[in-house]
Amino acid sequence: MAIPLVLVVLPLGLLFLLSGLIVNAIQAVLFVTIRPFSKSFYRRINRFLAELLWLQLVWVVDWWAGVKVQLHADEETYRSMGKEHALIISNHRSDIDWLIGWILAQRSGCLGSTLAVMKKSSKFLPVIGWSMWFAEYLFLERSWAKDEKTLKWGLQRLKDFPRPFWLALFVEGTRFTPAKLLAAQEYAASQGLPAPRNVLIPRTKGFVSAVSIMRDFVPAIYDTTVIVPKDSPQPTMLRILKGQSSVIHVRMKRHAMSEMPKSDEDVSKWCKDIFVAKDALLDKHLATGTFDEEIRPIGRPVKSLLVTLFWSCLLLFGAIEFFKWTQLLSTWRGVAFTAAGMALVTGVMHVFIMFSQAERSSSARAARNRVKKE
């Protein structure tokens, strides 16, 4: 039975925001005191800190909502996951694609060293956005004139990253919606391109730049395809917080970076061809309900559960001691202050939910304009 949202947002919000502020504070101290002297040591510690926060979101998906992620991969891809630097390119299908990536990274042992190219506004989100900034996520303004230098600088600084990392790049530039698909189809018709049915037309400038810079130190590109089966409801943050489950199928295919074309034009064509093939792959999945590759076991490790229990016990003990010491609930002013704090937490969680919703992302008109510029 679905749980009323109001009974979920407040306790989960308090848990995530308070633990997140603690993690953010430690990250800030380490950024100032350690990173200037040893970037490698800072990254190793920050990897652990990031997992202390991000594993709570993995727990929400895995244990609270019981979302099932089914991985399809060939033997080479499956054995390589988490053991090497990798550039991840994926279709952007749902509100929680980034969380699905975190789940797969956690299963592969590299959650704390996952990275992504994201829109600039993401880094201003309290707790989660700040943690991503400290973890060296790349934030772009969706204007190539401004973003080219930022992207190149951000990628070049990863050359000495001490642990295997995954860098996710959503080359479609925005989440898939029917309106954006229509805009992409109109543009494809005007340019004599294959009309997409299940994906958007990739924006390849960022991908070409990434391959050009990373081919010397990143051995692989993981072509990732995400789809929700027809008989399963679309996963959203709202549904997950309500404890409502879903099923997500993910197909991953490793491509050796050494086999990538050399010229920028050919790299761009390679990316576009991958998405044409991905479109056909999704057509086949819609018809058969599965991918051809073998289903790989990824389980549901208890690590995220243990981390969430740790934070729950720590913060509950701290809250009890705090209210004993301050006697905050013994006065009307204290009660009002506490109520205001809870309202603030609820408001911040509402912002998180709204931020994740695809229908609130870029409009179809903006999507059409971006495709034309590409």
Swiss-Prot record:
Q: What is its EC number?
A: 2.3.1.51
Q: How does it sit in the membrane?
A: Multi-pass membrane protein
Q: Which reaction does it catalyse?
A: a 1-acyl-sn-glycero-3-phosphate + an acyl-CoA = a 1,2-diacyl-sn-glycero-3-phosphate + CoA
Q: Which Pfam families match?
A: Acyltransf_C (PF16076), Acyltransferase (PF01553)
List membrane-spanning regions.
Answer: 15-37, 48-68, 121-141, 305-325, 335-355
Annotated GO biological processes are: CDP-diacylglycerol biosynthetic process
Keyword terms of this UniProt record: Acyltransferase, Lipid biosynthesis, Lipid metabolism, Membrane, Phospholipid biosynthesis, Phospholipid metabolism, Transferase, Transmembrane, Transmembrane helix
Q: Name a GO CC annotation attached to this entry.
A: membrane
Q: What domain of life does the UniProt record list for this protein's source?
A: Eukaryota
Q: Which GO terms describe its molecular function?
A: 1-acylglycerol-3-phosphate O-acyltransferase activity
Q: What InterPro entries does the entry give?
A: Acyltransf_C, Plipid/glycerol_acylTrfase
- Kindly indicate whether the keyword Transmembrane helix belongs to this entry: yes
Chief place of localization = membrane
Q: Where is this motif: HXXXXD motif?
A: 92-97
- Protein's pathway: Phospholipid metabolism; CDP-diacylglycerol biosynthesis; CDP-diacylglycerol from sn-glycerol 3-phosphate: step 2/3
Q: What class of enzyme is it?
A: transferase
Q: Where in the cell is it found?
A: Membrane
Which purpose does this protein serve, as stated in its record?
Converts lysophosphatidic acid (LPA) into phosphatidic acid by incorporating acyl moiety at the 2 position.
Q: Which family does it belong to?
A: Belongs to the 1-acyl-sn-glycerol-3-phosphate acyltransferase family.
Domain free text: The HXXXXD motif is essential for acyltransferase activity and may constitute the binding site for the phosphate moiety of the glycerol-3-phosphate.
Q: What is this protein called in UniProt? A: 1-acyl-sn-glycerol-3-phosphate acyltransferase PLS1
Q: Source species, please?
A: Zea mays
- Write the gene name: PLS1
